[in-house]
Amino acid sequence: MAIEATGVRKRFRDVQALDGVDLHVPAGMVYGLLGPNGSGKTTLIRSLVGLVKPDQGELHVLGARMPRREVLASIGYMTQAPALYGDLTVEENIHFFARVQGGGDIEPALRFVELWDRRKSIAGTLSGGMRTRLSLACALVHRPSLLLLDEPTVGVDPQLRAQLWDGLRAMAADGTAILVSSHVMDEAERADRLGLIRDGRMLAEGTVPELLALAGTERLEDAFLTLAGSRP
C-alpha cells in the first residue's frame, strides 16, 4: 500500500483541519481528493511528506512511518503554488530538483508537460499555466513511486489538461501511486477512486458510480452536496 492513513487529526488553533481522516491508496492507482478550498486537502498532503505533524493518527507512506528521508526520495510532491526559482531557466529549475531527488532525465519530464521547447526560458517570464506545468515536471523528473499533486492543473488549458491526465494514467499503469487534490468536479472524475472531503472529514470514498449510487444522484456535484448534508 503506497499510502495508509488512519484516524488522522490536525488542529490549527480554532480550526480542525483534519478530523479523523482515513485514506488508503495502493500502487498503480490515481486517487482523487475532492473538496472545496479549506476542506483539508492540502493539510493532508503536507502531512504525507512530513511538513505537517498530525496531532493524532497513523501515517504510513510506501511502507514506512513518516517522515523518513529515504522514503521522501521516492515521493514526488507538487505544491499548490509552484515552488520555482524565478530567475533561473526552465531547465535549471528542473535540473535542481532532479539533483535534490538523486537524479533524473529532464527531457522526458519537460516533454511530458510540453515545455521542452521553452527550456531556455527564464521561469519568471512564464505564464501561470506554464509555471504550473514546470512544477509538475519537477515533481516527476526522478520517476517517483508516489506522486502527490495539489491542484496540479490550475491555469492549464483544457486540451493540455486532458493530455496530462493521459500521462498520469500511463504512469499509474507502470505502478506509480498518484494522489491528486482538486475542487473541480470534472477533473476529479478522471481518478480511479475519489475521497470526498469537507471540513477536515472524509464524507465518503469510492469510484464515481459507487458515490453516485450511495447518494442516489446522477451528478457528482449533487452527490457531494447530498453526502455533505448541504442538500435535502
Residue ranges and their predicted role:
Residues 49:
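Helix-to-loop junction immediately C-terminal to a conserved catalytic motif
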Residues 57-71:
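Conserved ABC transporter NBD signature motif
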Residues 95, 99-118:
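Conserved ABC ATPase "signature" region
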